[in-house]
Regions:
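Short active-site neighborhood of thiol/selenol oxidoreductases, capturing the structured segment around
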Residues: 40-62
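N-terminal "domain-start" segment that seeds a small globular fold
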Residues: 10-42, 161, 165-166
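Thiol-/selenol-based redox modules, centered on thioredoxin-like
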Residues: 134, 139-167
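Hydrophobic h-region of N-terminal signal peptides that target proteins for export
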Residues: 2-8
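Short, internal strand/loop/helix patches
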Residues: 89, 94-96, 101-138, 142
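Alpha/beta-hydrolase fold active-site loops
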Residues: 48-49, 86, 135
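Conserved helix-turn-beta segment immediately C-terminal to the redox Cys motif
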Residues: 63-90, 162
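Conserved Rossmann-like nucleotide-binding pocket used by diverse enzymes
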Residues: 27, 40, 51-54, 89, ...
Length: 167
């Protein structure tokens, strides 16, 4: 039992060491939108970007979506100190395009950047960012560096407020 516990500690430490961390360069995500258009995270360089991993079938994600919508509406026109603006890059872990599109519509996710490979937990983007639970988010600055992770509710506002000149 002691060996097993010891193995578990080492295993989780190894996973933590390999994880995407604050201060790391955000890996590029290149996936298709619901209408089949290829969208790249790197196209948003120069802006503050919230990478938001979610799915239509995820209750906690759907409950968090109103906070994300509110933040988008509040900050999408804000003046930032070192960025051209604020954008959301939503990555869905859905398997059904219809369910994904319906959730975007139902939850009022009005921003342009919605992507998925419709592979659920086998999503290339989820693997790249080592996402093991959703909702998960990464705030990326204008230089493409991750400045915060897993911001929910007013935590997103508090972090974005550090980077704005005026609303």
């Amino acid at each position: 039992l002691l060996l097993f516990s010891s193995f578990e500690v080492n295993s989780s430490n190894d996973l933590e060491a390999a994880a995407i961390n604050i201060g790391d360069k955000a890996p590029d995500i290149v996936l298709e939108s619901p209408d089949g258009k290829v969208m790249k995270l790197s196209d948003l360089k120069g802006q503050m970007v919230l990478i938001d991993f979610w799915a239509s079938w995820c209750g906690p994600c759907r409950r968090e979506n109103p906070n994300v919508v509110r933040a988008y509406n509040k900050y999408s026109k804000a003046k930032f100190k070192n960025a051209k603006g604020f954008e959301i890059f939503s990555v869905s872990l859905d398997g059904s395009k219809n369910a994904w599109k319906a959730a975007i519509e139902a939850d009022g996710l009005v921003w342009k950047y919605h992507v998925s490979d419709l592979k659920k937990w086998n999503s290339a983007a989820a693997a790249l960012y080592e996402v093991r639970s959703i909702p998960a988010s990464f705030l990326v600055n204008a230089e493409g560096i991750i400045v915060a992770k897993n911001l929910r509710g007013n935590q997103l506002d508090l972090e974005l407020d550090k980077h704005i000149k005026s609303l």
